[in-house]
Amino acid sequence: KEITIAVKESGPDPESNPRLRMAITNAKGASMPKDNIERAINKGKDKDASSFTEVAYEGYLPNGIAVVVECQTDNLQRTISNIRSIFTRYGGTLGTSGSLSFLFERNGVFVLPKKEGLILDDFELEMIDAGAEEIEIEEDTITVSTMMENFGNMQKKLEELDAEVEIAELQRVPNDTVTLDLESAKKIMRAIEAFEDDDDVQKVFHNLELTEDIMAEL
């Protein structure tokens, strides 16, 4: 869907369409076959194809857990009905658009493999020059975070460096998180999973603190 929407929005040429470049990068990182990528591009070029709309729904789950559900849909009535139903089923409430935006910050996130022979000091300087806010270096991966307005600059810089980006996306990072006891947190995570299982849902963001105990249960 993301590739198709990007093509409909700004055309089928990745060179002049940063969003399409990002979508193709993510598809390749997820090992999507080349034929599937081409089909998605062609679907976006088809004027008669069903048109997808992007929409974000915001609301609260129990214990003050804020949730933003990003969707891509060809039927808004179906999608909002499903999202409202999930909120209700898990004891939450669907809010109005934009009501929770102050609780999250939009950041660009890039994940790439930590390749042998990479000179980390030089790489970090390149990233900082391109607008990196945070660089996390782990055993096998490097995660670079940037403010939303620097997303394009960072994408271009990584392309210039021929970096093998596995994930390139905009995320909603909570300004503060809420810590719950394990049982309450597990109920919240069941609700998050219900959102993620809906075919129209692309991403789900929340402000639940994912402690080690919670992660062990996932």
What are these regions (language model features)?
Residues S31-K34, L76-T79, I119:
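Helix N-cap / loop-to-helix initiation motif
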Residues P14-V68:
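Translation machinery proteins
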Residues V7, G59-L61, V69-T73, L112-E116, ...:
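Flexible glycine-/small-residue-rich
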Residues K1-N17:
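N-terminal glycine-rich anion-binding loops that anchor highly charged ligand groups
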Residues V109-L218:
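Positively charged, low-complexity, intrinsically disordered RNA-binding extensions
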Residues I3, I37, I83, M127, ...:
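Residue-level signature of catalytic and energy-coupling elements of molecular machines
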Residues E58-Q72, T79-E105:
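RNA pseudouridine synthases
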Residues P14-N17, E54-P62, L94-F104, A163-P174:
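Flexible hinge/switch segments at interdomain interfaces of large molecular machines
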